[in-house]
């Protein structure tokens, strides 16, 4: 008799992984969660809003996963998966409510899958949202043995009158940059082309470990700011770096004039540049030390930076807005 296991799908390992995942996801539950992992669908009660708008985002971790497999460090990329989604919906003023994940692999290893979900749960707790569902797909022959792919889906809510869309941006507004934790989750295909050995020493740690530093989650500090200040537009600096992401927060034709010397560039970016990547390409690929940008009235900028610093975030005035064509000008 031929069984499903003979084809490469281990149902028992799947049951084991779900049991481990449930323990981690339960730690993320917040008011509004009506059920958790194991049901056919996750349910969340919206609660009291006057005119709620649901805001959704989906993303993955990309080839950063390749380094995780090589280093055998699996939990940090789960945080990345959450960060990439919740930081995006935050750009429109949304508070993340719940998260779902998708894991795909050739042959399921319960402990590895559980470590990935452990990281996702940590990311959800950092963002204040609940992990209420997901899918783990075991597909023999589709992926290389020992490798996983990962994607996430975040849903948040914002009152309709409070949606942030860049419509109030004016010439003279100031750009506040919040520091990144490193490379975050973009540009890893380029890094992997340049680097052969991820075990090499980098300021006392293995380079691979430094590259696996999780993407910073900006949800809690930015939501705190929104209680006190009018933030006109926000940008999450992901793939495409400064050049692609900063113009996305403007509805009209504005130029973001950025002072490259106004913020600290982490050593990891200097290292990548030394491997042969020119500066313009770096700013068109990486966050260069700024993971999130706020567009605010110039009079509010000093207090916003003060509040961010008090919340443990490094923040800088990195530039200003001029009415010109929609682009970024680095000085």
From Swiss-Prot:
EC number annotated for this UniProt entry: 6.3.3.1
A Pfam cross-reference name: AIRS_C
Location in the cell: Cytoplasm
One of the record's GO molecular function terms: phosphoribosylamine-glycine ligase activity
Pathway: Purine metabolism; IMP biosynthesis via de novo pathway; 5-amino-1-(5-phospho-D-ribosyl)imidazole from N(2)-formyl-N(1)-(5-phospho-D-ribosyl)glycinamide: step 2/2
Signal sequence segment: none
GO BP: any one term: 'de novo' IMP biosynthetic process
Primary localisation category: cytoplasm
Reactions it catalyzes: 2-formamido-N(1)-(5-O-phospho-beta-D-ribosyl)acetamidine + ATP = 5-amino-1-(5-phospho-beta-D-ribosyl)imidazole + ADP + phosphate + H(+)
Class in the EC hierarchy, top level: ligase
GO cellular component entries: cytosol
Organism superkingdom: Bacteria
Keywords associated with the record: ATP-binding, Cytoplasm, Ligase, Nucleotide-binding, Purine biosynthesis
HAMAP family named in the record: AIRS
Entry's family note: Belongs to the AIR synthase family.
Entry protein name: Phosphoribosylformylglycinamidine cyclo-ligase
Biological classification of the source: Bacteria, Bacillati, Bacillota, Clostridia, Eubacteriales
Gene responsible for this protein: purM
